[in-house]
Every structure is written in C-alpha cells, then in structure tokens.
C-alpha cells in the first residue's frame, strides 16, 4: 500500500535537531510484514526526504512475508531493487565473443543486447544486507531470472551467503563458490548463484 501525504498536503515527516532519526517506511506500508528485529536509524537529512513511491510488487514465496523471513525494512529493499530491475538502461549494445568488449549499437542491430538497471544497497550494520541480497535474488529467481552473481569481499563469506539464501527456504547449495571452476574456463551452470 502506498503512503500518501497528510490531509493538509504536507509530507508526514517532521524535522528535528537530532543527527539520527528512527528509520520507518515512508512511501509504502506492507500489511503483515514483521518489524525489523533491531532498531534501525537513518540520518535526519535522509529522514526528511520521502523516497519515491515504487510501482513494483515482488514475487516472493508466501512464507517469506507470513513467516517473517524478511522484515518490513528488508522487504522495502526488495521492492526498490525490483523497481530498478524491471527496467533497462538506455541504449543498445554489442558484446564481443569473450564478453570483454561492450560497444554502443543501433537499437535495430541484429546482435544488439540491452542491460537491466542495477540497484546499490548501501545500508549500514544491522540492516541484514545478506538477507536483503538473498531476497532480491529470490524475487528475480521467481520471475525466471535464474542466474545471479553474489559478490563478497572474500570467499570466507560463502557460508554467510548460503545461510542467508537458505533462511528464505531455498537450497543453500545453489550458492556455488567461483573456486569450484577452473580459472579461464567456461562455467557450465545453466542456473544458480555464483
């Protein structure tokens, strides 16, 4: 459900002299969503600006919402990421055989491709970025986009990615380490999370 302005037309956000404000969903309301298990804050400047109203509705297993596998704040992230992933970047492109060279191409070129828009997740400690990332991948997965790259600082975070994916009711072994494949060789997976 989208949230609207107050009756007098003003946004329902109040300014204060605090540096941080308690985080709350501003543009949407997600009925039956669990509150985030820890207190989240945002800068007062961020809290004073209402985010855009998304038009996207995620495709997630019912249990994700009803069993509280993702909190309201984490679901908001999935919604905004889905809003971005539902559109393409401007222009058309050609990609060479190696995948190393991308060049602008006319829209009607026979071998032209388009690229989906991305989404940057910059939440701080305690927001559950791994769980949010798993939710974003799961939403794409449910729509048939079954190839994902999960990039982490080190391979030691593989178990964290597998934990977050399986916490959403998914098979943890679908998160496959890149080290399982020889460098410079094709990766034969037809679907999965690398």
Q: Where are the language model's segments positioned?
A:
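Short, solvent-exposed loop/turn segments at secondary-structure junctions
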Residues: 83, 126, 155-158
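Phosphate-binding P-loop
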Residues: 83-90, 109-118
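SF2 helicase/translocase NTPase motor core
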Residues: 2-20, 35-69, 95-110, 116-117, ...
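Carboxylate-rich, divalent-cation-coordinating active-site regions
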Residues: 72-75
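Walker A/P-loop
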Residues: 114-136
């Amino acid at each position: 459900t989208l949230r609207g302005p107050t009756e007098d037309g003003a946004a329902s956000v109040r300014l204060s002299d605090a540096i941080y404000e308690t985080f709350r969903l501003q543009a949407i309301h997600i009925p039956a969503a669990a509150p985030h298990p820890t207190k989240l804050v945002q800068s007062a400047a961020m809290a004073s600006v209402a985010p855009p109203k998304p038009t996207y509705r995620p495709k997630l297993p019912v249990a994700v919402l009803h069993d509280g596998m993702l909190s309201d704040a984490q679901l908001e992230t999935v919604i905004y990421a889905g809003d971005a992933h539902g559109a393409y970047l401007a222009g058309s492109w050609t990609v060479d055989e190696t995948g190393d060279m991308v060049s602008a191409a006319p829209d009607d070129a026979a071998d032209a491709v388009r690229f989906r828009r991305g989404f940057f997740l910059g939440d701080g400690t305690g927001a559950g970025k791994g769980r949010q990332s798993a939710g974003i991948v799961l939403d794409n997965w449910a729509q048939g986009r079954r190839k994902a790259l999960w990039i982490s600082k080190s391979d030691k975070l593989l178990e964290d990615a597998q934990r977050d994916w399986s916490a959403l009711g998914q098979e943890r072994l679908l998160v496959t380490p890149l080290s399982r494949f020889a460098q410079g060789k094709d990766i034969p997976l037809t679907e999965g999370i690398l």
